[in-house]
């Protein structure tokens, strides 16, 4: 298994993984995005934050990415994380591996807090976040409606940086000097 950064050309492979979830409550999207739209997401998010792929023999098994958690300027040092694993690759620790690399990259970029937003019930995602040191921040009750029922969403939080002093601007992932070394270490 090899971890690398995604590029817009990976949209079809990532979309194939995501398609397995579109009819579930794991995502609140109800219509599968087009390949062009997904490519745009990879390009847009990847301009600032990491979007990672776990692949084996050239096949995408899973992906994880981060994006800005809130719009207002003062929230700029937070990131929301997501991970999607191909169903036939579940149970291999891919989510843990991708999140671990994602968190290391985000910390070097200057992100101070990482968030996971999980529709309940989702035992696998809850276990992943707790295993990696996230704590439950709170529950948005009945915040989404999909597949004939109202759904709760739990927010997980993990501080990954210092909260002393004025923060420096985030380093966009393409400009992060440590990025190659972090990926190399993940692939040894």
Residue ranges: model-predicted function:
Residues 2-14:
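A short beta-loop-alpha structural element at the N-terminal edge
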Residues 5, 30-88, 99-100, 159-161:
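Acetyl-CoA-dependent GNAT
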Residues 16-32:
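Helix-loop element at the rim of GNAT/NAT acetyltransferase active sites that forms part
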Residues 65, 115-118, 130, 135-152, ...:
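Conserved catalytic-core motifs of GNAT/GCN5-like acyltransferases
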Residues 83-88, 92, 104, 120-121:
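Active-site acidic-Proline motif in GNAT/NAT acetyltransferases
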Residues 91-104, 127-131:
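Conserved acetyl-CoA-binding loop-helix of GNAT-fold acetyltransferases
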Residues 106-118:
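Conserved GNAT acetyl-CoA-binding A-motif
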Residues 162-188:
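Acidic/histidine-enriched, glycine/proline-rich intrinsically disordered or flexible terminal extensions
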